[in-house]
Swiss-Prot record:
Protein name: ATP synthase subunit b
Family to which this protein belongs: Belongs to the ATPase B chain family.
Assembly and oligomerization: F-type ATPases have 2 components, F(1) - the catalytic core - and F(0) - the membrane proton channel. F(1) has five subunits: alpha(3), beta(3), gamma(1), delta(1), epsilon(1). F(0) has three main subunits: a(1), b(2) and c(10-14). The alpha and beta chains form an alternating ring which encloses part of the gamma chain. F(1) is attached to F(0) by a central stalk formed by the gamma and epsilon chains, while a peripheral stalk is formed by the delta and b chains.
Keywords: ATP synthesis, Cell inner membrane, Cell membrane, CF(0), Hydrogen ion transport, Ion transport, Membrane, Transmembrane, Transmembrane helix, Transport
Membrane topology term: Single-pass membrane protein
Function: F(1)F(0) ATP synthase produces ATP from ADP in the presence of a proton or sodium gradient. F-type ATPases consist of two structural domains, F(1) containing the extramembraneous catalytic core and F(0) containing the membrane proton channel, linked together by a central stalk and a peripheral stalk. During catalysis, ATP synthesis in the catalytic domain of F(1) is coupled via a rotary mechanism of the central stalk subunits to proton translocation.
Membrane-spanning residues: 2-22
Any one GO molecular-function label of the UniProt entry: proton-transporting ATP synthase activity, rotational mechanism
GO CC list: plasma membrane; proton-transporting ATP synthase complex
InterPro entries on file: ATP_synth_B-like_membr_sf, ATP_synth_b/b'su_bac/chlpt
Organism from which the protein derives: Helicobacter pylori (strain HPAG1)
Amino acid sequence: MFLVKMVLGFLILLSPLCATGLDVSQTDIIERSLNFLLFAGILWYFLAKKLRSFLRSKSLEISKRLEEIQAQLKVSKENKKKLLKELEQAKEKAELIISDANKEAYTITQKYELQTKMDVENLIKNSKALMDLEVKKIKRELVESVFKDLRESKKVSFNVQDCVNILKQRL
């Protein structure tokens, strides 16, 4: 079949030469064409099986490599899916960790705010208590110094009951 196609193709290529009106008898184109066709046929006869086997082996080689590449591609796609799942899980875990950390930070902040508030209230109470003690101490010292001055001046006389009443009223 191939040989027939070659001969027809060759004749089609030679058809313009026949139409030109040249004298073909003085050229050896027909002999050369027949020699070429004979040479091509002999080459085809001897090399066809080897060429076919070579082309089949190359085709099988290419098919095997294609299958290997497709297998690698499939493995790569599976790995990609696996890694994407792991990435999603890692993102979810990170979000969970962040939300837990925010909750914990809020709880710790509230705890320290409450502790600080209680400490401030205790400091205020203690300072008020200290101020009250200091005020009482100063009043007592003032009253004592006034009584001492009054006793020493001897212009005013007090008995013990009057002193006790004055001290009770003032302190």
